[in-house]
């Protein structure tokens, strides 16, 4: 009889970062500025790469694709956050919730693989510079980008598809600022063990595989740089990798802290902050990390501005 009286939940409520009424307007302004800078930075970088023929090379095609993934990651989360800051209705349908997670998850996974192929590009450029034009053609670069996005979309599609096997009747409140799939498992009436197991297996494989590939690539790169006799050559080689290495460190460093905080039972607010950095701050920083000290990007910007 109790089973019959259960009401199935079809809409969820996102609690957001805080329920304090006095903070809603200031937070809206802060995250609106962050979101606008993120879009201008990433979409501007994409437009610059598309517009300037000097940047039609593999590394910048990868960089443009990374900028697109960052813009999509930020948009999938921040746009709904901004609406919720000003709206009293924080309701979200199951379909919209699944869609939000799908686009966030697919672009986050894509970014893992884009960082790997960018490291491979740097490996070929530094370890085999004479073969670089042959090995890293624009067509191969396009294939790498396509494969990265395909894996990202497929990975998210699997988890979103399995999400619809669950029913929700305990609560419709998600104590988070976006539809994070693990938060949905907490309020599921159906046993989510299969879903959790598959997320752990897929995520562990993707993150360990991509991280170890990055470690191996940079081990070879570092070895090749240290073998260079010219200090100027070593300095130039380090500078070509520094931006990517910083981006990788931020990306996987945040993932590591998110994992440690979840395993140690840290406060929910602390977990939110790590997730906030991963979903909103990294997409904000990336275009500036790759652009501010990049002579080719700055020169391209000057050429466009002169026109």
Swiss-Prot record:
Residues 50-56, 121-143, 217-239, 293-307 are cytoplasmic. The chain crosses the membrane at residues 29-49, 57-77, 100-120, 144-164, 196-216, 240-260, 272-292. Keywords: Cell membrane, Disulfide bond, G-protein coupled receptor, Membrane, Olfaction, Receptor, Sensory transduction, Transducer, Transmembrane, Transmembrane helix. It holds the Pfam family 7tm_4. One of its GO terms (molecular function) is G protein-coupled receptor activity. Its main location: membrane. GO terms for cellular component: plasma membrane. Disulfide bonds join 97-179. The keyword Disulfide bond applies. Residues 1-28, 78-99, 165-195, 261-271 are extracellular. The keyword Nucleus does not apply. It is a multi-pass membrane protein. It is found in: Cell membrane. Odorant receptor. Belongs to the G-protein coupled receptor 1 family. This is Olfactory receptor 5AC1. It comes from Homo sapiens.
